[in-house]
């Protein structure tokens, strides 16, 4: 089957990009590709059979219909206007036309210098490329909206970060790479007509049902706010910390994008800071909902030339509504509740207080809770708490709450185990795969990808265990 590509961004949004070709790496080689995603997208297996070089995966060749461009965007970093930020190392190769008429961006990260590279070198390193591939696929199989990873190319090109590393490329796929920062770029350049063109592009291709509706811009922004709210709710319930929620890392479609200093909670710590460069804790775990709203407010500001402020403020309310509604639904599912009762939040917050005080493992606590039997006061979770009297008191109230619903244990446990993962991408697991890959051994990278495809399956190996102490102390930075 022949793949078809279009170039809607290039054709419809002039002055938002620079056309250029990727810059290949030295001795590039394909080390991993996403076989399941490739099958879903009808990508011929022959494209991955590259024995001499890395082909399209390393930017050495293009497929028919591809018209590569580097997109320009700006944004706020750590709450401060930073001006033009990129795309300094990513190139949109083209947009694949799918059978249902939709499209999918093929975006090559680490593709070389662009006019927007600022002081950067246009490269990505193997370490960060592996992390992003693992994280995006882990999030997908957890059911959280995200960009996807299609392939990784390694090389012998030296790249200087904190230490000397080697260059790599990631083929990232997404329905769109449109970010809040695209709108900010033209708003601060005092080009409101281009901001409106971006909004028109988004509506035309992703919300076509509103194209001819007079209030289309308000409806569109309401949906952006709601999608962002639902996304943040998903992050908070699964214990995901993004680490660098700058406005240029926020997706118009409500996707998780730009995996840098991310982390999943090990010990439950609501103030967890995954990014060691975040000295003020702006992007700490429990501040993510507030930061997302702040970012939406920055996006709303760019829309003031063609949306009234009152309408924008009403639309922003959709964020909080979506966040709280979706978070409440998800947490009730995690606790095994089928109905909403007035004291549910009290019970949840009491559990969080216990977990924070004891340093309980976030994912394992909820997974173990999913094995609760209403009539049994014993629980394997009890042995993980030092203050067993406090746990027993909470557990009695929890079982009493379960008995208020006419749901048997088997059905409830089944629901809980569909939303409480046994496996998440802990930083130490990613680091183990990286360490092996940097020595030329890709087996752990491939196997970890397989493990992450079944996050809700119980395991008795270390992929589902608490991290070793050294694994809790790994520092992650924006360096990638």
Swiss-Prot record:
Enzyme class: transferase
Molecular function GO terms recorded: AMPylase activity; ATP binding; magnesium ion binding
Positions of Mg(2+) binding: 249, 258
The UniProt record lists the keyword Magnesium: yes
Cofactor field: Mg(2+); Mn(2+)
Swiss-Prot/TrEMBL catalytic activity: L-seryl-[protein] + ATP = 3-O-(5'-adenylyl)-L-seryl-[protein] + diphosphate; L-threonyl-[protein] + ATP = 3-O-(5'-adenylyl)-L-threonyl-[protein] + diphosphate; L-tyrosyl-[protein] + ATP = O-(5'-adenylyl)-L-tyrosyl-[protein] + diphosphate; L-histidyl-[protein] + UTP = N(tele)-(5'-uridylyl)-L-histidyl-[protein] + diphosphate
InterPro entries tied to this protein: adnlytase_SelO (IPR054838), SelO (IPR003846)
Pfam families for the chain: SelO
Its EC number(s): 2.7.7.-, 2.7.7.108
Active site: 248
Residues holding ATP: 86, 88-89, 109, 121-122, 172, 179, 258
Keywords, in A-Z order: ATP-binding, Magnesium, Manganese, Metal-binding, Nucleotide-binding, Nucleotidyltransferase, Transferase
Family note: Belongs to the SELO family.
Function recorded in the entry: Nucleotidyltransferase involved in the post-translational modification of proteins. It can catalyze the addition of adenosine monophosphate (AMP) or uridine monophosphate (UMP) to a protein, resulting in modifications known as AMPylation and UMPylation.
Entry protein name: Protein nucleotidyltransferase YdiU
